[in-house]
């Protein structure tokens, strides 16, 4: 249990409070037991440790054959054995009850103790843990609730053969007192355990959602260049190889890094991302490798860097081309033997971490210019993946635009269902210097500006409208303009035919085979147009 989970327990108060219940010889026998149990509870913040000792005291001093403590999981509405003596591990596993089921379930349901003078003859006896109704032993079984603020938290039960019925009554009273004494500890355990289980379940749910989200098949885009990227992700994800992701800003390099990690054997471990671009040299070292207490002004405590945080998982170094020569040198060592020292420290720190790096810079040119270490480049460039710019993924623009429209419609409480043909033409003819990130921003703006269920051309920013109207905004060559017009005509024909290649070819006056060749050249897939049916 955490240090914050504490409670006040007055040993003398409990002993004095319960002392009136016993007289004479019984009092002499029972009060030392109560006092001993109260000391056990006071000195143990851990429920399992405390219960184990309490049950041991019951077994030693009360000659009980079996002792059982159950806890009530209100979320699952089940009662389970938390600790016991006289039961095997297999028997403990079988001790799971619903509320109202068997003697234990009835005690939790009613909040009242049950005494079975002859256990095997009691109508609620289930025999789930050991004994059967046909057994010869005439053991009594008594089960009392563990309660706190009128809420049943669990039960404590015992089994023993009694020759004197008066002793049974005294033991039931004693067990009731023990239940009262352990109730605060049980309550704190349940509160913390429920929260821990909730967080664990939430963590599992989020990790599963991330794994589903970052499946290569869930990345939007069916163009040939992206199919090649998916194939590379599939091949490298299951390995421990260092990956270098190349591509312009906004193409989705971080998405590729996520897909690799969440489809790897280390998917359950951490993925730690560090953006190297905005960090000055001294902060970059501390960010990546951590620092020791007092290593510089303001270093009041030891700090673990990204590499230590990612131990057992993956670190994603975004914009790795921006690192200073000093940090580059330290990174070479990490790549070589997975060891480093924190800033201000001399003790080597060893980590087991997979490295994925990304950059929009031309590292080969930087190596030639002497601004990027050659040995670092070759250690990073084990398995390069180049993410194509959006202008080379013609058919993906429509699929991505539709995805963003749906997402931003939900986010903004709108009901935008489609993009008009003129608006689609503008999206297809634009060269997207900001790539997918720019398209995302454009579609968010368009959804916000839309007054009905359609994205119109006038909902798009002026830069797209100007480019479509003039056809010269990009400074394209004649050949590039001809290709753009040809691509636009093919897209329009496929939209009109709902992706049917034969009908589109007929509309364009081309043979089906020739249209297929041109579609492959421009990376256009007929599947992207089936929604127009």
Swiss-Prot record:
SUPFAM superfamilies: GAF domain-like, Homeodomain-like, P-loop containing nucleoside triphosphate hydrolases. One of its GO terms (molecular function) is ATP binding. Coiled coil: none annotated. ATP binds at residues 247-254, 310-319. Residues 33-193 are annotated as: A domain. Residues 219-448 form the Sigma-54 factor interaction domain. Residues 46-186 form the GAF domain. AnfA is essential for nitrogen fixation under Mo- and V-deficient conditions. It is required for the regulation of nitrogenase 3 transcription. Interacts with sigma-54. This is Nitrogen fixation protein AnfA.
């Amino acid at each position: 249990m955490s240090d914050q989970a504490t409670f006040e327990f007055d040993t003398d108060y409990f002993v004095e409070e319960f002392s009136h219940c016993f007289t004479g010889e019984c009092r002499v026998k029972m009060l030392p037991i109560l006092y001993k149990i109260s000391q056990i509870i006071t000195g143990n913040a851990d429920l399992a440790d405390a219960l184990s000792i309490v049950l041991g005291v019951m077994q030693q001093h009360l000659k009980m054959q079996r002792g059982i403590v159950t806890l009530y999981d209100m979320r699952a509405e089940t009662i389970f054995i938390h600790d016991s003596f006289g039961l095997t591990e297999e028997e403990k596993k079988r001790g799971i009850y619903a509320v109202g089921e068997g003697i234990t379930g009835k005690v939790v349901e009613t909040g009242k103790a049950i005494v079975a003078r002859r256990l095997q003859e009691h109508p609620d006896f289930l025999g789930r843990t050991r004994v059967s109704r046909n057994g010869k032993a005439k053991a009594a079984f008594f089960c009392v609730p563990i309660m706190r603020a009128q809420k049943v938290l669990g039960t404590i039960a015992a089994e023993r053969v009694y020759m004197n019925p008066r002793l049974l009554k005294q033991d039931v009273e004693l067990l009731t007192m023990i239940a009262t004494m352990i109730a605060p500890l049980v309550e704190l355990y349940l509160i913390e355990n429920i929260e821990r289980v909730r967080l664990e379940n939430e963590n599992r749910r989020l990790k599963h959602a991330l794994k589903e989200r970052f499946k290569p098949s869930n990345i939007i885009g069916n163009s040939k260049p992206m199919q090649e990227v998916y194939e590379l992700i599939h091949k490298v994800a299951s390995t421990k190889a260092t990956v270098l992701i190349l591509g312009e800003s906004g193409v989705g390099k971080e998405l590729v890094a996520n897909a690799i990690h969440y489809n790897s054997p280390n998917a359950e471990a951490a993925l730690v991302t560090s953006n190297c671009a905005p960090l000055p040299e001294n902060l970059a070292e501390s960010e990546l490798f951590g620092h020791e207490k007092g290593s510089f002004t303001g270093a009041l405590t030891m700090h673990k860097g990204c590499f230590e945080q990612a131990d057992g998982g993956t670190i994603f170094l975004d914009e790795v081309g921006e690192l200073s020569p000093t940090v580059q040198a330290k990174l070479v060592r990490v790549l070589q033997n997975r060891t480093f020292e924190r800033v201000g420290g001399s003790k080597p720190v060893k980590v087991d971490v997979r490295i994925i790096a990304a950059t929009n810079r031309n590292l080969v040119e930087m190596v030639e210019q002497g601004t990027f270490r050659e040995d670092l480049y070759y250690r990073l460039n084990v398995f390069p993946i180049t993410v194509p710019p959006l202008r080379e993924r013609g058919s993906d623009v429509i699929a991505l635009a539709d995805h963003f429209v749906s997402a931003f419609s939900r986010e903004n409480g709108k009901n935008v269902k489609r993009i008009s043909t003129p608006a689609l033409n503008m999206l297809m003819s634009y060269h997207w210097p900001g790539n997918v990130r720019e398209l995302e921003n454009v579609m968010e703006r368009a959804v916000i500006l839309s007054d009905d269920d359609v994205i119109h051309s006038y909902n798009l920013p002026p830069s797209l409208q100007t480019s479509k109207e003039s056809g010269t905004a990009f400074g394209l060559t004649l050949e590039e303009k001809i290709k753009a017009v040809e691509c636009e005509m093919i897209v329009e024909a496929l939209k009109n035919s709902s992706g049917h290649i034969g009908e589109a070819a007929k509309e364009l006056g081309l043979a089906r085979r020739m249209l297929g060749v041109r579609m492959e050249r421009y990376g256009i897939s007929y599947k992207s147009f089936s929604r127009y049916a």
